[in-house]
Every structure is written in structure tokens, then in C-alpha cells.
């Protein structure tokens, strides 16, 4: 019987030095910093991305009223409002309305700056159910631009929209009775330069 072969001595696992741990911590810190910094630029980019792709129930944009007459079918449109990181009060004048499909409708939201400083915000938005976003079409909306508010200022802002008649032709929408339009206002860190001409909202009008 042959004697057992000698086993090679086991080498201890290489120890990670302090430099490796420091590098990992630095990378994690950089990622967090980038995420925080990007959050201030995320609202306009997110809106652009969603308008381009239709992601997350984002509505469509139109520059003219629909050519066909409104349909007999109606849906309930609910209006939601939220504020994130701004000293603002933000709410719709009406919580919900009945809308004939294809009819152009104007509703208003009101914002109030509750602070003693001038502030600027911009709204991100979406529609639920998410599949309805491609049929919910806006002609005019305060969410298209930044909204500066002086200390204590209030403003009524219109949303002009219609639901595309193609909504009724899509069988997936047969059970849809309620559509929710939701906005969330975020602060703008570096607002765009204010133009020389005034860009205040047009005087209020009733439903188109």
C-alpha cells in the first residue's frame, strides 16, 4: 500500500485591504449624490420621456379640437393633486365631472404659495388606468411649463382636454367607468429665465 501523498498547505484567503472598502464606500456615495442631484432635473425629463413614449399613463398633446362630434357615452374624470417638497397648497376646483367622449372640457386647479419666499414648481402628471393615457388628450395645461409663485400668491390654472373617440372603439376600455388625472408639483432648483413679456394665464373661460 502506497503512503498517502502529502497535501499542499492551504493558502489563506487574501484579505481585502482598507483601500478596497474605501473605494466601495466612495462609489456608493457617488451614486447616492447623483440620484439626489438628478431628482431636481427629473421632472422635466420624466415628463418629456413619458410624453414621447406614452409610459406610465401619460396623456397626449393636441393643438386643435377633435373633428368628430362628441359621443353619447360618458366617463367620470376624477382630479387628484399632490405637492412634494414645496410650501404650496394645490387642489382642483372640482373633484370629478362627467365627460362625454370627444367633448372638449376646461377645468381649473388652484395653487397658493404658503411661504414668505418666491418659489418655482413644475408638475409631473399621469392618468389611470394606465392604458387610457393614449386616449386622454390635452390641448392646454399648466404642466407644460414651470410655474413661479411670489410669496402668498394664488393662481387659477386651466386644463383643456378631451377623451379621444377612439377610446370607445377599444374593447379594453369597455369596463372603464372612471379616469383619474393626477398631478404632483415638485420644486425647480434652477428655474428658466423669466421672459420680458408677461406669461400670466389667460382670463378664465367656461367649457369650450
From Swiss-Prot:
Belongs to the COX11/CtaG family. It is a single-pass type II membrane protein. One of its GO terms (cellular component) is plasma membrane. Residues 43-208 are periplasmic. Its main location: membrane. The keyword Transmembrane helix applies. Exerts its effect at some terminal stage of cytochrome c oxidase synthesis, probably by being involved in the insertion of the copper B into subunit I. One of its GO terms (biological process) is respiratory chain complex IV assembly. Gene3D superfamilies: Ctag/Cox11 (2.60.370.10). Residues 1-19 are cytoplasmic. It comes from Rhodopseudomonas palustris (strain TIE-1). It holds the Pfam family CtaG_Cox11. This is Cytochrome c oxidase assembly protein CtaG. It is found in: Cell inner membrane. The chain crosses the membrane at residues 20-42. The keyword Metal-binding does not apply. One of its GO terms (molecular function) is copper ion binding. The gene is ctaG. InterPro entries: CtaG/Cox11_dom_sf (IPR023471), Cyt_c_oxidase_assmbl_CtaG (IPR007533). Keywords: Cell inner membrane, Cell membrane, Copper, Membrane, Signal-anchor, Transmembrane, Transmembrane helix.
Amino acid at each position: 500500500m502506497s503512503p498517502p501523498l502529502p497535501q499542499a498547505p492551504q493558502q489563506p484567503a487574501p484579505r481585502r485591504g482598507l483601500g478596497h472598502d474605501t473605494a466601495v464606500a466612495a462609489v456608493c456615495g457617488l451614486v447616492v449624490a447623483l440620484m439626489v442631484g438628478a431628482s431636481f432635473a427629473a421632472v422635466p425629463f420624466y415628463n418629456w420621456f413619458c410624453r414621447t413614449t406614452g409610459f406610465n399613463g401619460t396623456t397626449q398633446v393636441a393643438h386643435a379640437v377633435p373633428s368628430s362630434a362628441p359621443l353619447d357615452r360618458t366617463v367620470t374624470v376624477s382630479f387628484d393633486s399632490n405637492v412634494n417638497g414645496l410650501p404650496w397648497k394645490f387642489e382642483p376646483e372640482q373633484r370629478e365631472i362627467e365627460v362625454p367622449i370627444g367633448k372638449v372640457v376646461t377645468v381649473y386647479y388652484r395653487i397658493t404659495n404658503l411661504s414668505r419666499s418666491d418659489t418655482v414648481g413644475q408638475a409631473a402628471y399621469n392618468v389611470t388606468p394606465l392604458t387610457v393615457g393614449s386616449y386622454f388628450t390635452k390641448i392646454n395645461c399648466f404642466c407644460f411649463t414651470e410655474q413661479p409663485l411670489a410669496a402668498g400668491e394664488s393662481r387659477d390654472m386651466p386644463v383643456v382636454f378631451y377623451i379621444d373617440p377612439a377610446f370607445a372603439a377599444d374593447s379594453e376600455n369597455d369596463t372603464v367607468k372612471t379616469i383619474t388625472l393626477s398631478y404632483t408639483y415638485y420644486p425647480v432648483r434652477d428655474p428658466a429665465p423669466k421672459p420680458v413679456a408677461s406669461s400670466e394665464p389667460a382670463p378664465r373661460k367656461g367649457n369650450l
